[in-house]
Amino acid sequence: VKRPMNAFMVWSQNERRKIMDQWPDMHNAEISKRLGRRWQLLQDSERYPLSRRRSVRLKHMADYPNYKYRP
């Protein structure tokens, strides 16, 4: 079972699609660098709405009630 996505991962999914639509030939490594820089510039309130973060976590907890992270 995978860990629930953190705020950056959820945010970057949507942003990655936008970048790929504009620049379909851009390498994934370059996209990741751009996303990282943009993420660092965002205010905490812009990064990811608290309600969405909670819903992702709550869904994961409901789907996997006995889940325990083990590295």
Curated annotation (Swiss-Prot):
What keywords does the record list, in alphabetical order? DNA-binding, Nucleus
UniProt GO BP: brain development; camera-type eye morphogenesis; negative regulation of transcription by RNA polymerase II; neuron differentiation
Query: Which GO terms fall under molecular function for this chain's record?
Result: DNA-binding transcription activator activity, RNA polymerase II-specific; RNA polymerase II cis-regulatory region sequence-specific DNA binding
Claim: DNA-binding is one of the keywords in the record: yes
Which residue ranges does the Swiss-Prot or TrEMBL entry mark as DNA-binding? 1-68
InterPro entries in UniProt: HMG_box_dom (IPR009071), HMG_box_dom_sf (IPR036910), SRY-related_HMG-box_TF-like (IPR050140)
The superkingdom of the source organism is: Eukaryota
Q: Name one GO cellular component term.
A: nucleus
A Pfam family that the UniProt record links to this protein: HMG_box
Instruction: List the subcellular locations.
Output: Nucleus
Q: State the coiled-coil residue ranges.
A: none
What PANTHER family does the record point to? SOX TRANSCRIPTION FACTOR (PTHR10270), TRANSCRIPTION FACTOR SOX-12 (PTHR10270:SF221)
Q: Identify this protein by name.
A: SRY-related protein LG27
Q: Lineage of the native species? A: Eukaryota, Metazoa, Chordata, Craniata, Vertebrata
